[in-house]
Regions:
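Conserved non-catalytic scaffold segment of RNase H-like nuclease domains
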Residues: 1-99
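Amphipathic alpha-helical interface surfaces
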Residues: 65-72, 92, 108, 112, ...
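Short, surface-exposed basic-aromatic patches at helix termini and helix-loop junctions that form
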Residues: 99-105
Length: 172
């Protein structure tokens, strides 16, 4: 998913696609060790797949070739010359590269996660928030630096978890 946002915070364009040749070919990520209620459980993977099919049926998503996705990105880059950003941009670069989508077409980019770690992650009140809310890494039990944890600290703990559906993660 991609969202073009103006300097005033208004969404100018958005695009949500599932990659042709990949969607439905591979199972969605799931950890069989997790309980059914966990987001990354096998039960959740089935719910998430149903949700993707509902998005296709409603027109919220298309199934698009990497070439079509690249064309949309190229056009958006030509129209707006945006700064490419994402939370954990290196992850997105890698996933897109694996599907032959070139994010290197953008002349400016920065990683929101790196910025959040430098500005928010080092704050004592953020770290205490993570301990209080049990937003800790599994192995080392250190404060999480995830988009969810950061957003809950900034906006409030009542904020719903991100849906991990690319477009909504970027837009909402």
């Amino acid at each position: 998913g991609a969202v073009i946002v103006g300097r005033d915070g208004r969404i100018v364009e958005q695009f949500g696609a599932l990659v042709f040749g990949l969607f439905g070919k591979f199972d969605l990520f799931a950890d069989p060790a997790l309980p059914d209620s966990a987001f990354w459980s096998e039960q959740s993977a089935q719910r998430r797949m149903k949700n993707y099919h509902a998005m296709i049926d409603s027109g919220e998503r298309s199934i698009s070739s990497p070439a079509l996705i690249q064309q949309w990105l190229w056009g958006a880059n030509q129209r707006y010359q945006p700064t490419l950003t994402a939370y954990n941009l290196a992850f997105d670069f890698g996933k897109c590269r694996n599907t032959r989508i070139n994010l290197g077409i953008f002349s400016r980019s920065f990683c929101l996660m790196k910025a959040a770690k430098k500005v928010i992650g080092i704050r004592a009140d953020y770290q205490q928030f993570c301990y209080d809310q049990d937003l800790l890494t599994a192995k080392k039990r250190k404060p999480q630096m995830t988009a969810d944890a950061m957003a809950k600290f900034i906006i409030g703990n009542d904020l719903a978890d991100e849906p991990h559906t690319a477009l909504e993660d970027a837009r909402d």
